[in-house]
C-alpha cells in the first residue's frame, strides 16, 4: 500500500520543553525521529523561524532639528548615526497592522531609554531599559518613529517613500521576533533500535512571542508550504476506519501508560523501558518487570492494582499487538476509555 511510505515511519511520541534562566530562551526536544529526519526537520524549522515569522520594527526616525543621519545634536553625546544603531535594537510587540507613529521627548541631563517612548494602541516596548542616547545639562531631544509590521530583514532603501518629509531617515528593519536558533541531533533509543534521532531546538526570542508558539508557527508554515506537493487524497482515515471495525482486542489497551496516574518512580521506570501503551505493559511478565532498572516490588504491586481495576493483568498475550497505525487507532478511541 502506498500509504505505508509515510504511515510506517516512526513519529515523535515525546515533545519536551525546557526553560532556561533567560525567560526568552526555550529548548524543544522531539524524539524519536527516523534516522536523518532530525537534520532535515531541524534545519527547515531553524530557517523558517529566522526568516518567516512576522513581527514589528521601527522603519524610520525623524529627529527634530536634524536633516540627515551624519549630523550631531547639541548636548547629545551620541551622534545621529550611533542613535540610529541603538534605535534598531528596540524590541516592539504590536498585534495591529502598521504603520504607526510614536514619539519620545526628553530634557537633560539624563538617559533616553526605550521605555520613555510614548506608544499607541496595543504596542509594547519589550526592552524598556535599552539606551537610545545620553543628554547633557540643558539638552533636549524630540524623536518621532514610524513602526511597521512585516517579516525578515528589510534594508533602509526599501523603507523610503516618495512623499516623505524632509529629515525623515529610513533605517534597516529586522522584523523577526527570533534572535537566535540552534539545533543539535543525537542518537536515541526506541525499543531495540538504538540509532533513531533526537532533535533539540534552542530558540531565543525578543519577547514578542514565546518559544513554544514560535515552533508551532514555524511547523504550520512548513506544513502549508509542503501541502501543495501532495497530489492525492489522504487514505489514512479510511484505513483507520477499516482497522477499527476489525479490532480484535480491548480498545483500552490503546491508552497510554502516562494516563494511569502512577507514582513518579513507576512512571519513570516504564518510560525508561520504552513502554508507551497499556497493551505494551500487560504483555510483560512480573519477572521481566522486576528486571527493569530501579523497578521494585512496590512499583510492581502498584501497577498490578491499577491493571486489576481495569480487568487486566501482567503476562497477557495479544496476538494482534502492536496493531498497524497504532497512533491513529489510539486517537480514534481516546474518547471511549
From Swiss-Prot:
One GO molecular-function annotation for this sequence? DNA binding
Q: Which SMART domains match?
A: RPOLD
Q: Offer one example of a GO biological process linked to this entry.
A: DNA-templated transcription
Which stretches does the entry tag as region Alpha C-terminal domain (alpha-CTD)? 249-337
Q: What keywords are assigned to this protein?
A: DNA-directed RNA polymerase, Nucleotidyltransferase, Transcription, Transferase
Family per similarity comment: Belongs to the RNA polymerase alpha chain family.
Record function comment:
DNA-dependent RNA polymerase catalyzes the transcription of DNA into RNA using the four ribonucleoside triphosphates as substrates.
Please state what the protein is called: DNA-directed RNA polymerase subunit alpha
Which organism is this entry from?
Bartonella bacilliformis (strain ATCC 35685 / KC583 / Herrer 020/F12,63)
Supply the gene name: rpoA
